[in-house]
Amino acid sequence: MCALVSRHVAIHSKDMHVSLLDQNSSIRSKLIQETVANKCIKNTDTVVPILDISAGEINPADISMCDTRFKSECGNPSTRKDCTYEDKQLDNRRIHLWGAVSKPGLGIITIPEVRDRNHDKTYIIVENRANATAVLCREGDSGAMVCADDDYGSGVEAISMLIGKDTTNPGKYATFRIDKGLQQLEKQTDSSFSLCQD
């Protein structure tokens, strides 16, 4: 089992470990070197820039302390559902995250597909909900999973992973599709990655 962390956090680890904290426990996770390295992924004829995601292995003795369930907007542990929506179908979708600081952060997807031509990457832009009393996220929340309650009340969809705030547009934040992040980890490590099922 692995923990997913922001690469921009992982690269600052002096001993290739990160601490994973919740209300009841602290676990140290050993970062997988290939997911932290500052390099592009080489495909057959192209070079693909990397997304802001790294992985750390959980010690088997610590796995029982991990709660792998996703939380609904109300904070209830819930069944994880795969997000099968195309990018454009995510427009105006109400989302939430449970980060290190924001518990919860509430937002909305406002731009479901932004292409960064300089780096050949695609992002999803999310922002604070109108009339919300709190912001979607705060410093320290990067790496949080951006989720949406399933339209039919049967679980939580994991959509993307939070990178951080858009410094040029207050109240807006950049994320990337989590399936793209998992694909990157697979290419970097020649291993299989998937989100935990509860």
Describe every region a protein language model picked out.
Residues 151, 166-169:
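Active-site signature of cysteine proteases
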Residues 156-164:
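Catalytic Cys-His active-site segments of thiol-dependent hydrolases/isopeptidases
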Residues 1-139, 147-150, 163, 175-182, ...:
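Serine endopeptidase catalytic core focused on the charge-relay Asp
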